[in-house]
Curated annotation (Swiss-Prot):
Pathway: Catecholamine biosynthesis; (R)-noradrenaline biosynthesis; (R)-noradrenaline from dopamine: step 1/1. GO terms for cellular component: chromaffin granule lumen; chromaffin granule membrane; extracellular space; secretory granule lumen; secretory granule membrane; transport vesicle membrane. The keyword Thylakoid does not apply. Homotetramer; composed of two disulfide-linked dimers. Its cofactor is Cu(2+). This is Dopamine beta-hydroxylase. Keywords: Catecholamine biosynthesis, Copper, Cytoplasmic vesicle, Disulfide bond, Glycoprotein, Membrane, Metal-binding, Monooxygenase, Oxidoreductase, Secreted, Signal-anchor, Transmembrane, Transmembrane helix, Vitamin C. The lineage of its organism: Eukaryota, Metazoa, Chordata, Craniata, Vertebrata. Binds 2 copper ions per subunit. Cu(2+) B binds at residues 404, 406, 479.
Amino acid sequence: MQVPSPSAREAASMYGTAVAVFLVLLVAVLQGLAPPESPLPYRIPLDPKGDLELSWDVSYTQKTIYFQLLVQELKAGVLFGMSDRGELENADLVVLWTDGDNAYFGDAWSDQRGQIHLDSQQDYQLLRAQRTPKGLCLLFKRPFGTCDPKDYFIEDGTVHLVYGVLEEPFGSLEAINTSGLQKGLQRVQLLKPKISIPALPEDRRTMDIQAHNVLIPSKTTYWCHLTKLPQDFPRHHIVMYEPIITKGNEALVHHIEIFQCTNQFQNITSFSGSCDSKEKPQELKVCRHVLAAWALGARAFYYPEEAGLAFGGSNSSRFLLLEIHYHNPTNIRGRYDNSGIRLHYTAKLRHFNAGIMELGLVYTPVMAIPPKESAFVLTGYCTAKCTQAALPPLGIRIFASQLHTHLTGTKVVTMLVRDGQEIEIVNRDDHYSPNFQEIRMLKKTVYVYPGDVLITSCTYNTEDKNEATVGGLGTQEEMCVNYIHYYPQTQLELCKSHIDPCFLQKYFHLVNRSNLGEYCTCPQASGTTCPQASGTTCPRASVPEQFASVPWNSFSRVVLKALYDFIPVTVHCNKSSAVRFPGKWDLQPLPEIISKLKEPTPRCPTSRDQSSSSLTVVNIGGGKV
C-alpha cells in the first residue's frame, strides 16, 4: 500500500520510493524475532510526572534491547532516544509523530541545532502498537550496535535517555525542532547483567531505613536522615536490600544511599534535613562507609550466597545515615515522601564476610585538573606491592562496584593488570555522570591475586571552569574512586595513590621560572619536607593557592599532564584503622604495562530485515495519534 511520505525530500533521500508498511493495530511486524510476551523486567518513569514510562529487557544472544514506551497522555507525538550527555541535540532518536492525517514511526536523529532528520538506516523496529487503559503502548527493538554513524552505540555503563513531547501535528519530520519542546532526560544502566538470584535464608529479617514524612523540596535536593540500630544489636549479615519508594514519587526519588558511621562518636545529634544545611551536625562527616546504594532503574541487590555484609556488633557504630537525592525539576509541590531502603539480614553468618575497598586517588589537592579541559585524565594505582602485602594467598573475588567522582567526572574505568599485562576490565563507564551513582553487580566475578595491580582512571571535563579543580572532599573539589565489593574481607580497606608532592613543587618552580617569576607558586610553609628553590622571594602558599596562581597556557598544561603520567607515586595501602601496612610506600614507580587489552569494536548486525528500510505508518484510533 502506498502512503504519503512526510516530505518528498525525505522520501527521496531515504528510500527512492514512497512505499511504506501499514501497521494494523495490535499486529506485530513479522520481520525478525517475535517480541517477548512476558512483561519487560526493568521499568523507570522518564518524566517527573510519570506520564512517560519506559520498560525494557536485554537479549545478549541477539545483542538487542526490547523497549516498551507507555505514553499515558499522548498529544501529537513523542521523541525518545539516547545521547552522549543527555542533550536532545545530537541525539539518536525514534519518533512517533502525526501530520494530522496519519501517524508515523521512524528512526531519526537530531543535529546540533536540534533539527530532526529521518535516518537513512532504520534500526528501531516497531513490533507492536496498541491502546491500553493506561495509554498508548509502543513495543520496539534496537541492536546494541548498528554501525550507523548517526546511531548511539549501546554499551555497559550509564546511558543518557532523552525524550521530547510533540503538542501539535507537523507536516514533515524536518519541521520539528527540539528547542521548543517539553523535554528531559533520565539516566539508567540499560545493559543489566543476567545473573542468577541466590535463595534467601529462611530466618532472614528486614529493617526499613526510611525518611519520615519529608516534604519534597521544590528543587533538586540531597536529604539526610540520621537513624540508629537498636541497643545491643548483635552482628548480622546483610544478604539483600531493595528500594522502598513512596507510591506516586517514583519519578522524584533519584537515588538513595545508606552510610554507616564510624565508632568515633558514642553519640551523634539527631538530624533530618537538607544535607547542605548549616544545622547539619559536624559529626556526620564520619558517616562515609557505604552500606547500601540504589539508583533509579536498579532492582534489589543480592549478595553471593556464600557471603554477606556485616553490620551491628560491639565494634560497630549504631548510627546510620540515610541520604536521598530528590530530583524535582518541574517544582511539583505538596508531595510528601517516606522512601528508603529495606535491608534483608540474617543472624546466621555466612561463610565469608563481604568487604568494601576503595581504589583510585587519595583525596588530596596535589591531584588537580586544569580549567577549560574537555577530557583530562587522572589515574590512581593499587600496586602489586600492596596486594602482595595485604591479600590472602587465594586472592579475593570482586562481585560488584560503585564508581564515584564529583561534578566534573565524565568517565571512570578500573583495569586489572597481572605481570604487566592488562587482564580484564573490572568496571567501566564511558558515559559516567555524578548524578547517577549505584552499586552495580558485575557480569562475572573478577579474581584478584597477590601481586596484581588495579588501575583506576577518571576523565574530567572542566570547560566551564576558570581555575584548576583540586582533589579533596568538598563538592567543588574532585575525587576518583571505585568502591569494589568483594569477599573474603581482608584488612585492606583503601588502596590508592597520589603523585609525590616534592615533584609537584618542582613543577610549580618550573612554571614560575618559565614566566620569569611573574606568578607566585612558592611551596607552603609547613606540611612538606620539599626543599624550596633558591632565589624565591614571594610568600609561601598552599597547594590549592599554588594551582590558582598557575597561568594555564599550553606549556603548563602539557607539563602537568606529563608529570601525572610518569613521576613516582605515594601509595596508601591502608587498613581500616587508617594505618598503612608495613613497608616503604613513598616514591613508588608506576606499574609497567607491556600489553594492553584491545578496545572493543561495535559489532554490526549480520543481516537486516526488509522493514528496516521502510517508514512505518501507525493506525491508532482512526489513523491519528
